[in-house]
Swiss-Prot record:
Entry binding sites for ATP: 210-217
Protein name: DExH-box ATP-dependent RNA helicase DExH6
Superkingdom of origin organism: Eukaryota
Residue stretches making up the Helicase ATP-binding domain: 197-366
Acidic residues: bias regions: 992-1006
Residues annotated as domain Helicase C-terminal: 537-711
Localization (cell): Nucleus
Keywords annotated in UniProt: ATP-binding, Helicase, Hydrolase, Nucleotide-binding, Nucleus, RNA-binding
Organism encoding this protein: Arabidopsis thaliana
Domain (R3H) ranges: 15-82
GO MF annotations in UniProt: ATP binding; ATP hydrolysis activity; helicase activity; RNA binding; RNA helicase activity
Length: 1299
């Protein structure tokens, strides 16, 4: 399969023009990517320019390309990721040659580990709790949350009659309601009211297809409610879903207004964080995600028992939730005959949805917009070349490309009018249809029997003025009748010579204009990159529009923020547009503050023209009612997902025909308008009909987990194949792999207890695991912020001017420095913390303005945090009093570890900088080199001389400029060693190991060629290999001081000792056991040995975090508790006093540094009160080192859980004075001075990287703990003799000095 080549017939029809070549090559590459082949080779008839174009397109699409051969034999081949399967082996080979980075526990951790393993030594029972537990299905059913919002109202028939009478009375008496009712009656959907209610009564599923503005969204729910109340006198629960929360809220408010009610009475809504109404509301609007959680959370039996109607609006948007929801509802319909499903769409894709539901009836409702003239790139170039000609003359404006869907009645009327005109010379009816309802569909309509068109009739009858009118309207003279005659031939046959001459001249001019336009197009395409927006062309076109007209807003559709900003800057640099009194330039983008966005709805004063620069948000989400001119770049930035390379993509791509139609319609809302498409007619014809459904361009981990929660016995792939457009198999495989890595699914794809808990939290499964970890290490508060920020938009605003943008970047750096710097994620944590404290002081507006923070985003994060906190309390994961759950929220090591858990496995290694290149390059697990985005705080990270530091990041995004990561954070090595999927050990690089590697590779090659021989000797040779691996592994781990290579997830190599590998392995096992215990017993305290282990892990992470801050910023230690002044040289951003006062306000109240929290105050919820004594604290700190001090404002000495590494002392090998643990093995002290080899029959991992076995790790960790605590005793059976405690020399000296 790997070398299989893909051939197609596409080369045979290779076009010659530049534009056609791009379209053809795109089709070939997309077909290849969708195929199962690895290589595709183009034919030899490609020019150098064509090969260059294909190379460029391949880079953008994540496909490798290579040209080979010379002359006529030169070929271009394209490949799918060739290094995909080999990258980890390549990384291993590379690590053998390079100097390994050393990783070890931080100074001070030895004392913590000694105490832990002394009282809770490793044993086989530690790892028993880490095995996956299959979800039984009982706990979830018992703990289901009942939401009355979606239950049917409890009202009697008499009460229904009262509601109907009250509504009728309001509509008759209230003047405002009378006016509203009058407007409602003029909506196109009004005449379809009876047809809709009748179809709903007769069919379980119907589809309403109506153009934007026909009234379906606001009127259909009212039609159904009135029908149930007035005609049937029955209660109902009508649930209407919208893809966006703002739509759900605004539509429900509009309907309440139309009925003269307050929102929340009979009409309500429920969106994330907000709701109005309740069970008493008969109509409820919600987002698709809300209804999906209802369907999944309650189970198929009870989820729709009280719902009578489900209206799914805007199904043409194809968001993943709606597609997934429709698949669930389709399965529920047969067992719920009372349920009615109403689908509503604004596009022509109705047939697919109708077929998906067994051919359900379709009600088509026409819309109303003014005619819109459509021009393409050829026309725009000709207009700009023509110079002084006014392209907006009244004649040209009347030309319309407005697409009209002809009904059967329209066709019948046209047939009759054509026959009357041709046979009886009665032209009034035909002229009336042509002039009053002008569109290309009418101008070029062909009689169903004779195929005659209106132009043929007028030409054959010699009506010269009517022929000229139709030709000016764009009627097609080349259409043929059933006899095979065109309008020109028909005029000549009827001896209408003047009409024939007019048509002939028009045809010649059209051909000449067409040739001229094509020449202009070819010349233009040869000089620009069509994949990018031509800002200069947009500026010239806008100047032409403004010169030929005096009023009318201009709406420009652009792909993204960069293009919006470039266009705005270009316009402001032009003196013609720089006058703010004449032009009001407004940007419409999610990064623009809400106050600025609202200006788009205001009409400008007389003499001022409004120019709106927008993304596709202006296609349907908002309506700007004074737009007359639309400039469509034809491009849009859409987030997608490449499952083959496992990267997200955010690229500028061509829109679909449906998108282009929506953009065109924006020009005809208030009066006839013009749409300028800045792409050719050929490109327009090649566009897809509809955009790719979201479920095909996103990772599907959450959906796969929801499938298993919905039906634990169902195969994920089997259910997802029921969707209208299932995700590709590779996406599903990637999702299942991640869910298995984090323990949500077993290797057999069974739902685990951990996965069941993850699935019921309203965050991504990876974020759920982070929350559990944060609770265990008492770092909940920042974890809540990180979890909610990952599910919401960027909280920082992007100013327009370059100077302000530099200030915004500096502000973000300053915020990040509060948490240690080198992070985009921690900048959000700091921003929220400062905003929350500023809000309490009444300074939130000042803070948001000074640090370019979006107030609305902060408010939303605050609400999302509250909701997530409530969910965690409801599931018992955190207590009602969470004051003790965030005591380590300011500790840099623990905070970054929490972040690493939430972002794993998105880990990269920083590449060293070369020469003068200051850009940060990161190597990922796949071997790819990606850049850090220019908007990231870590854009210039390489200049800080980091030595192969690790970064964790949200996602890899492939954009127009290549692959990059946007939000990332520098991470320490130790947290990733604790949370990674796999760690494996091998001897450090030597000639022997290299030779053995080569031999193994040769063996693998021989095995590949002689499968039958190997199969015959599998048993005997397998036993020999197993023994050899065991012998080598035992030798490698036989001594604690042995240097070994530690490989994380088969690609990140480190150098460490055998002892530290063993200790790390035990900590990993106990960490996973703690998480699983917390999942299965959320309201119980951790067992003593797990609670002690989490204490140890938190302490080690704290030490590790401080060890990584060799020159910490001033903000890391507040002034009121600073024990010494640090040299902050080298830190680029220092928080000012205003920011420091906001961030450290909590610490000011407590008068202590967060990392100095007393150890026995930690984990009050996760551990029993007596557990705090199970690990002896680092007592008598000054006794161990009389030079150490701990100064505070109060002057009191405090015991520390975590010692500040910058004030670190040499730790003695102190013996613990705590009581022996019941977990301690009987022979741990008696044989502690023996070196205990690993079992010789232990099986290891692959040939090069031996996975650390618990049988090896446990004895080594246990022996080392017992070595450091020796007891000189006589016969253990002699209980009458007192044991003498061995005290190291340094500790004896300390005690003597104290005396």
């Amino acid at each position: 399969m790997g070398n299989k080549r893909f051939r197609s017939d596409n080369n045979a029809g290779k076009p010659t023009s530049v534009e056609a070549t791009r379209i053809w090559a795109t089709k070939v590459i997309e077909d290849f990517r969708a195929s199962g082949n690895e290589v595709y080779t183009f034919e030899h008839n490609l020019s150098n320019n064509e090969r260059g174009v294909i190379h460029q397109m391949c880079r953008k699409m994540g496909i490798q390309s290579k040209s080979s051969g010379r002359g006529e034999q030169r070929r271009l081949s394209i490949f799918k990721s060739r290094h995909k399967n080999g990258n980890k082996n390549e990384a291993n080979e590379k690590s053998n040659k390079e100097k390994l980075k050393c990783v070890s526990f931080p100074p001070g951790a030895d004392v913590i580990l000694q105490e832990l393993f002394t009282h809770y030594p490793p044993c086989d029972g530690d790892t028993a709790a880490t095995s996956f537990t299959k979800y039984s299905g009982n706990k979830g059913k018992q703990g289901q949350w009942k939401d009355d919002f979606f239950r049917k109202p409890q009202i009697s028939s008499e009460e229904i009659l009262e509601k109907v009478a009250s509504l009728s009375s309001r509509l008759k008496k209230d003047k405002a309601l009378k006016e509203i009712t009058k407007l409602r009656s003029k909506l196109p959907i009004t005449s379809f009211k009876d047809a809709i209610t009748s179809a709903v009564e007769s069919n379980q599923v119907i589809l309403i297809s109506g153009e934007t503005g026909c009234g379906k969204t606001t009127q259909v729910p009212q039609y159904l409610l009135d029908h149930m109340w007035s005609s049937k006198r029955e209660t109902c629960k009508i649930v209407c879903t919208q893809p966006r929360r703002i739509s759900a809220m605004s539509v429900s408010e509009r309907i309440s207004c139309e009925r003269g009610e307050s929102i929340g009475e009979n009409i309500g809504y429920k969106v994330r964080l907000q709701s109005k109404g309740g069970r008493h509301s008969s109509v409820v609007f919600c987002t698709n995600g809300i209804l999906l959680r209802v369907l999944v959370g309650k189970g198929s039996v009870s989820s729709v028992s009280d719902i009578t109607h489900i209206i799914v609006d805007e199904i043409h948007e194809r968001d993943c939730y709606s597609d997934f929801m429709l698949a669930i509802i389709r399965d529920l319909l047969p067992s719920n005959p009372h349920l009615r499903l109403i689908l509503m769409s604004a596009t022509l894709d109705a047939e697919r949805f109708s077929g998906y539901f067994g051919g359900c009836p379709v009600v088509r409702v026409p819309g109303f917009t003014y005619p819109v003239r459509t021009l393409y790139l050829e026309d725009v170039l000709s207009i700009l070349k023509s110079g002084g000609d006014n392209h907006l003359s009244s004649t040209n404006l009347s030309i319309s490309d407005h697409k009209l869907d002809l009904t059967d009645e329209d066709k019948l009327a046209l047939d009759e009018a054509i026959i009357l005109a041709w046979t009886n010379d009665e032209f009034d009816a035909l002229l009336d249809l042509v002039s009053s309802r002008g569109s290309h569909e009418i101008y070029n309509y062909q009689h169903q029997s004779t195929w005659l068109t209106p132009l043929m009739v007028f030409a054959g009858k010699g009506r010269i003025s009517d022929v000229c009118m139709l030709l000016s309207f764009g009627a097609d003279w080349s259409l043929k009748s059933k006899d095979g005659m065109t309008a020109l031939e028909l005029a000549e046959a009827e001896n209408q010579l003047e009409a024939a001459q007019i048509i002939r001249e028009h045809a010649d001019n059209s051909q000449s204009n067409s040739q001229q336009g094509q020449q202009l197009l070819d010349k233009y395409m040869a000089t620009i990159n069509p994949e990018q927006v031509d800002v200069s062309l947009i500026q010239q076109l806008m100047r032409k529009i403004c010169g030929d007209s005096e009023d009318g807003a201009i709406l420009v559709f652009l792909p993204g923020w960069d293009d919006i900003n470039k266009t705005r800057q270009r316009l402001l640099e032009n003196p013609f547009f720089a006058d703010s009194a004449k032009f009001d330039i407004i940007c419409l983008h999610s990064m623009v503050p809400a106050g600025e966005q609202k200006k788009v709805f205001n009409r400008p004063p007389p003499g001022c023209r409004k120019i709106v620069l927008a993304t596709n948000i202006a296609e349907s989400a908002v309506t700007i009612d004074d737009v007359v001119y639309v400039i469509d770049s034809g491009r849009m930035k859409e987030k997608s997902y490449d499952p083959y390379n496992n990267v997200s993509t955010l690229q500028s791509s061509w829109v679909s025909k449906a998108n282009a139609k929506q953009r065109q319609g924006r020009a005809g809302r208030c009066q006839p308008g013009i749409c300028y498409h800045l792409y050719s007619r050929l490109r327009a014809a090649s566009m897809p009909d509809f955009k790719v459904p979201e479920i095909k361009r996103m990772p599907v981990e959450e959906l796969c987990l929801q499938v298993k929660i919905l039906d634990p016995n169902c195969k994920t792939n089997d259910f997802l194949q029921k969707l209208l457009d299932p995700p590709v198999d590779q996406s599903i495989a990637n999702a299942l792999s991640i869910l298995q890595d984090i323990g949500a699914l077993t290797p057999q794809e069974e739902l685990t207890e951990l996965g069941e808990k993850f699935g019921h939290l309203p965050v991504h499964p990876l974020i759920s695991k982070m929350l559990f970890f944060a609770v265990l290490v008492n770092c909940l508060d920042p974890a809540l912020t990180l979890a909610c920020a990952a599910d919401y938009k960027e909280p920082f605003t992007m100013p327009m001017s370059p100077v302000e943008r530099q200030k915004a970047a500096a502000a973000k750096l300053e915020l990040a420095s509060l948490c240690g710097g080198d992070s985009d994620h921690l900048a959000v944590v700091a921003a929220f913390e400062c905003w929350k404290n500023a809000k309490g002081r009444g300074l939130s507006a000042e803070f948001c303005s000074q640090y370019f923070v979006s107030p609305s985003a902060m408010k939303m994060l605050d609400q999302m945090r509250s909701q997530l906190e409530s969910e965690l309390k409801r599931h018992g994961i955190i207590p009602n009093d969470i004051s003790s759950c965030s005591q380590n929220s300011r500790d840099p090591g623990i905070l970054r570890a929490v972040l690493a858990v939430g972002l794993y496995p998105m880990v990269g290694r920083l590449c060293p900088a070369f020469g003068n290149n200051r850009r940060t390059i990161v190597e990922t697990a796949s071997g790819a080199k990606v850049r850090v985005h220019s908007l990231s705080n870590n854009f210039n990270l390489s200049s800080k001389k980091y030595d192969e530091s690790l970064l964790v990041f949200d996602e890899i995004t492939r954009g127009d400029g290549g692959m990059h990561i946007r939000n990332c954070t520098v991470a320490r090595d130790l947290p990733l060693l604790l949370i990674s999927t796999e760690i494996a050990v091998a001897p450090t690089g030597s000639s022997d190991s290299d030779d053995s590697n080569e031999e193994e590779e040769d063996d693998e090659e021989v095995a590949a060629n002689t499968n039958e021989e190997v199969a015959a000797n599998t048993n005997e040779e397998g036993m020999d290999i197993h023994k050899e691996e065991s012998r080598r592994g035992a030798k490698m781990m036989s001594s604690p001081e042995n240097s070994v290579k530690l490989v994380v997830d088969r690609w990140l190599p480190f150098r460490t000792t055998a002892l530290e590998v063993a200790q790390m392995y035990i900590l990993r096992e106990r960490l996973m056991a703690s998480i699983l215990f917390k999942v299965t017993h959320p309201r119980e305290h951790l067992p003593p040995h797990l609670g002690a282990s989490m204490h140890a892990i938190a302490g080690i992470l704290s030490y590790d975090g401080h060890a990584g801050l060799s020159c910490p910023p001033e903000s890391m230690v507040p002034k009121h508790s600073r024990t010494e002044m640090y040299d902050t040289g080298g830190w680029e951003e220092k928080p000012n006093s205003f920011l420091n006062s906001l961030f450290w306000s909590l610490s000011l109240k407590e008068n202590k540094h967060p990392s100095h929290t007393n150890r026995n105050q930690q984990h009050n919820y996760n551990m029993a009160p007596t557990e705090a004594a199970s690990i002896p604290r680092q007592q008598n700190y000054k006794q161990r080192n009389p030079k150490a001090t701990n100064n505070t404002d109060s002057g009191k000495k405090k015991e520390k859980m975590f010692v500040n590494p910058t004030n670190r002392i040499n730790q003695p090998e102190a013996a613990s004075t705590g009581k022996p643990s019941k977990h301690k093995s009987a022979n741990s002290s008696g044989s502690s001075n023996k070196k205990e080899n690993m079992p010789s029959d232990q099986a290891y991992g692959n040939k090069q990287h031996n996975t650390v076995p618990r049988e090896a790790a446990a004895p080594m960790a246990k022996n080392q703990s017992s070595k450091k605590t020796k007891t000189r005793s006589g016969n253990n059976s002699d209980s009458g003799k007192k044991k003498e405690q061995y005290i190291p020399k340094r500790q004896r000296e300390d005690k003597a000095e104290q005396k």
